[in-house]
A protein has these predicted regions:
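Alpha-helical scaffold segments that flank or form the walls of functional sites
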Residues: 74-125, 129-151, 183-198, 445-453
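Divalent metal-coordination and catalytic microenvironments
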Residues: 9, 27, 32, 53, ...
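Glycine-enriched alpha-helix->loop->beta-strand junction motifs that scaffold or abut catalytic
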Residues: 223, 227-232, 264-267, 284-293, ...
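Active-site microenvironment of metallo-dependent hydrolases
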Residues: 1-25, 30-33, 40, 361-454
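His/Asp/Glu-enriched, well-ordered alpha-helical/loop segment
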Residues: 261-268, 310-394, 410-411
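Metal-coordinating catalytic core of metallo-dependent amide/deamination hydrolases
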Residues: 131-272, 280-282
Length: 454
């Protein structure tokens, strides 16, 4: 069903900021697109979706994740460690035990968690490509995402050199030559990449880091290859002071200055984290059009700090919201990410640092902007019908004078009456209709036991 009329909602949060942030009325969807908004009469035979007691928002857009980490939550050894040691004790410790079953189960867990929190678009930064694999991780991830019906952006990661840590006894991450990496990205792009503004599938060029994962001089070639293929660029940057120290010691400059010299700034580039950027780096990001995948919960959990997302947003820069891998936050859902952003910036900058409407815009319009999915991210005629109906009939929301912002400012596990991608229903009454949760729980337990025992 891609034609229907949503009626009786409490209100609509459009994904815009300012005067256009709210609308009231009905939403008509035709051929998976938003056709009209207002006081609308049902046409004869038109399907009606009753949104009584619901707030309607655009589908939420997660711009940075590592789905393979969804079976690595709450590993005791890594719970109280900062980034470098956590990497060694958790994802780098387990990566070589992630076989086809483990990746499929992990991706299913992560996608279910996201979809049940209102996500309709997921960008996953996957960087595990071992020659030992007898399966294709790219194909597996697209197939799994296809079951959920979400828009899926696969950021094809990888490294040409490994990273070692003090006291390292982990299996090194798999590496490949630069030619191998570029050939594999090109192959994936030819099969999966759709450049349309309402694409369901995208490929992005995404080396694991521009600093620790590549040999000097490779960044420019990677950027040129990506742009030649019509692909966007993504990576981690400035997640903590390790990045600052690395570029200062090796190149005598800060991370954003350094990547700017290697053609890694522009409106087709976005970075996860950017926690330690100084004001000049933020200005450079804004002027170039490069975007941020803001990961507030992950950065807080690992003690990395708070990214200057508010500073970039004030300049008019591209800020999006992301959950990052579940191994480093234990709750990789979009409502927790929204609530974390809303509260953390106020803790640092004061009560006026971030409004609910701006936080939502990062999770919707901002996500569409950094991913280049311009037909999504806001509720307006002519946009894709990626829509979420959040129920507010819960003690969590009772007593609120402004009922529209409840899903953002109250946190907690939401109840979604309906969720749509291009007008196709993916959630009904708080459930993913096709997904057997009991089986998924058993699969998760089996995989976790195997990871812990080997």
């Amino acid at each position: 069903m891609t034609d229907f009329l949503i009626q009786n909602a409490k209100g609509i949060l459009t994904g815009h900021e300012g005067a256009g942030a709210r609308r009231y009325g009905d939403i008509r969807v035709i051929d998976g697109m938003i056709a009209e908004i207002g006081a609308l009469e049902a046409s004869p035979g038109e399907k009606i979706v009753d949104a009584s007691g619901c707030v309607v928002t655009p589908g939420l857009i997660n711009t940075h994740h590592h789905l393979f980490q969804s079976v690595m939550k709450a590993v005791p050894e890594g719970m109280n460690e900062e980034l470098a040691k956590w990497l060694r004790l958790v994802p780098y410790r387990y990566w070589d035990r992630i076989d086809e079953e483990a990746l499929r189960v992990s991706a299913t867990i992560g996608l279910a968690e996201l979809v049940l929190s209102g996500a309709t678009t997921v960008s996953d930064h996957h960087y595990l490509y071992s020659p030992r694999y007898d399966f294709d991780p790219v194909e597996l991830l697209f197939e799994t995402a296809g079951q959920f019906g979400v828009r899926f952006v696969l950021c094809r990661g990888g490294a040409t050199r490994g990273r070692t840590f003090d006291g390292d006894n982990t299996t090194p991450l798999p590496t490949e030559t630069l030619d191998q990496m570029l050939q594999e990205v090109g192959k994936a792009a030819r099969r999966w990449n759709d450049p349309a503004p309402n694409a369901m599938r995208r490929i992005v060029m995404a080396p694991t880091t521009p600093t620790f994962s590549l040999a000097d001089g490779e960044l420019k070639e990677i950027a040129a290859c990506a742009r030649g293929l019509g692909l966007r660029l993504h990576s981690h940057l400035s997640e903590n002071t390790d990045y600052d120290l690395y570029t200062k010691e090796r190149f005598g400059m800060r991370p954003v200055e350094w990547i700017a010299q290697h053609d890694w700034l522009g409106p087709d580039v976005w970075f996860a984290h950017l926690v330690t950027c100084d004001p000049e780096e933020v200005r450079m990001l804004h002027q170039s059009g490069a975007g941020m995948a803001h990961c507030p919960q992950e950065n807080a959990r690992l003690g990395s700090g708070v990214a200057p997302a508010d500073m970039l947003a004030e300049l008019g820069g591209a800020v999006s919201l992301a959950v990052d891998g579940a191994a480093g936050n234990e709750a990789a859902d979009m409502i927790t990410a929204l609530y974390s952003a809303f509260t953390i910036h106020r803790a640092v900058k004061g009560a006026g640092a971030l409004t609910a409407e701006r936080a939502l815009s990062w999770a919707t319009a901002g996500g569409a902007r950094v991913l280049g999915l311009d037909a999504t991210g806001v509720i307006a005629p002519g946009k894709a019908a990626d829509l979420v109906l959040f129920e507010t009939h819960s003690p969590r929301y009772f007593g609120q004078h402004d009922p529209l912002i409840g899903p953002i400012v109250s946190g907690g596990e939401p109840k979604i009456r309906r969720s749509y991608v291009a007008g196709r229903e993916i959630v009904r009454d708080g459930k993913i209709p096709w997904l057997d949760m009991e089986k998924l729980a058993a699969d998760a337990d089996r995989v976790v036991r195997r990871l812990a025992q080997t």
